[in-house]
């Protein structure tokens, strides 16, 4: 028999040989506590009544006052006994509840241990290591495949990377020189704008006078 079977017994329900279960015993103790608590309340009321009666009779009826005080003392004694009994029962109930809790905890731990054992029955540490190695190999293979797929393929066309870079640098230099020439070219001086208003022409009469003078000059030169 396993250690848990020795602790809790094979039957599991009733404690050994038909005895009460912890739950039944705990419930009975609680019922007893409730009964004694009600008895306490009753005795406290009786003590209050006898004290009132003793004060009422006082010096008028000493015999009745003394009887009331005697009854009060008896009730107080019973109340003290019940207080002690309640303390004992409360201690016993708490101990039983703790024991029952520990029992349930151990049962559940045993149940979990059996479940774990059953889960590991078909496992072998060497097989686990082999499986983890297979997983690592497959992951590595997947990485290699992904890298191969993502690598650009020229489909038979191969180019010299250095030659392409040199050509690119040459094109960049040509473009740079062109931009510099455009920036440092001859500066053009803007011409003045042509006036939009037409200049006044010579008067027609003045032009005729000049023509007459020229003719007169020609005639004088011919007569000499």
From Swiss-Prot:
It comes from the Eukaryota. One of its GO terms (biological process) is nervous system process. Keywords: Acetylation, Cataract, Coiled coil, Cytoplasm, Disease variant, Endosome, Host-virus interaction, Membrane, Nucleus, Phosphoprotein, Protein transport, Transport, Ubl conjugation. Residues 23-183 form a coiled coil. The modification Phosphoserine is found at residues 184, 223. The modification N-acetylserine is found at residue 2. The keyword Lipid biosynthesis does not apply. InterPro entries: Snf7_fam. ISGylated. Isgylation weakens its interaction with VPS4A. It is a peripheral membrane protein. Residues 8-19 have a biased composition (Gly residues). It is found in: Cytoplasm, Cytosol; Late endosome membrane; Midbody; Nucleus envelope. Widely expressed. Expressed at higher level in heart and skeletal muscle. Also expressed in brain, colon, thymus, spleen, kidney, liver, small intestine, placenta, lung and peripheral blood lymphocytes. Probable core component of the endosomal sorting required for transport complex III (ESCRT-III) which is involved in multivesicular bodies (MVBs) formation and sorting of endosomal cargo proteins into MVBs. MVBs contain intraluminal vesicles (ILVs) that are generated by invagination and scission from the limiting membrane of the endosome and mostly are delivered to lysosomes enabling degradation of membrane proteins, such as stimulated growth factor receptors, lysosomal enzymes and lipids. The MVB pathway appears to require the sequential function of ESCRT-O, -I,-II and -III complexes. (Microbial infection) The ESCRT machinery also functions in topologically equivalent membrane fission events, such as the budding of enveloped viruses (HIV-1 and other lentiviruses). Via its interaction with PDCD6IP involved in HIV-1 p6- and p9-dependent virus release. Belongs to the SNF7 family. PANTHER family: CHARGED MULTIVESICULAR BODY PROTEIN, CHARGED MULTIVESICULAR BODY PROTEIN 4B. Its overexpression strongly inhibits HIV-1 release. Probable core component of the endosomal sorting required for transport complex III (ESCRT-III). ESCRT-III components are thought to multimerize to form a flat lattice on the perimeter membrane of the endosome. Several assembly forms of ESCRT-III may exist that interact and act sequentially. Interacts with CHMP6 and CHMP4C. Interacts with PDCD6IP; the interaction is direct. Interacts with VPS4A; the interaction is direct. Interacts with VPS4B; the interaction is direct. Interacts with CHMP7. Interacts with CFTR; the interaction requires misfolded CFTR. Interacts with PTPN23. It is linked to Cataract 31, multiple types: An opacification of the crystalline lens of the eye that frequently results in visual impairment or blindness. Opacities vary in morphology, are often confined to a portion of the lens, and may be static or progressive. In general, the more posteriorly located and dense an opacity, the greater the impact on visual function. CTRCT31 includes posterior polar, progressive posterior subcapsular, nuclear, and anterior subcapsular cataracts. The acidic C-terminus and the basic N-termminus are thought to render the protein in a closed, soluble and inactive conformation through an autoinhibitory intramolecular interaction. The open and active conformation, which enables membrane binding and oligomerization, is achieved by interaction with other cellular binding partners, probably including other ESCRT components. This is Charged multivesicular body protein 4b.
């Amino acid at each position: 028999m396993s250690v848990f079977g020795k602790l809790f017994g094979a039957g599991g329900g009733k404690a050994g040989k038909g005895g009460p279960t912890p739950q039944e015993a705990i419930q009975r103790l609680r019922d007893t506590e409730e009964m004694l608590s009600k008895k306490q309340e009753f005795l406290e009321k009786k003590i209050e009544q006898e004290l009132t009666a003793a004060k009422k009779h006082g010096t008028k009826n000493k015999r009745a006052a003394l009887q009331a005080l005697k009854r009060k003392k008896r009730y107080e004694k019973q109340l003290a006994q019940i207080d002690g009994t309640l303390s004992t029962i409360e201690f016993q109930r708490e101990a039983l509840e703790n024991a029952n809790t520990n029992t349930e905890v151990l049962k559940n731990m045993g149940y979990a241990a059996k479940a774990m054992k059953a889960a590991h029955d078909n496992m072998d540490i060497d097989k686990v290591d082999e499986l983890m190695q297979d997983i690592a190999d497959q992951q590595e293979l997947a990485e290699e495949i992904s890298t191969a797929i993502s690598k650009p393929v020229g489909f038979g066309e191969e180019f010299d990377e250095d030659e392409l870079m040199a050509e690119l640098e040459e094109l960049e230099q040509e473009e740079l020189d062109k931009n510099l020439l455009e920036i440092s070219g001859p500066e053009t001086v803007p011409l003045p704008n042509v006036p939009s208003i037409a200049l006044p022409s010579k008067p027609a009469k003045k032009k005729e006078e000049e023509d007459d003078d020229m003719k007169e000059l020609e005639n004088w030169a011919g007569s000499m």
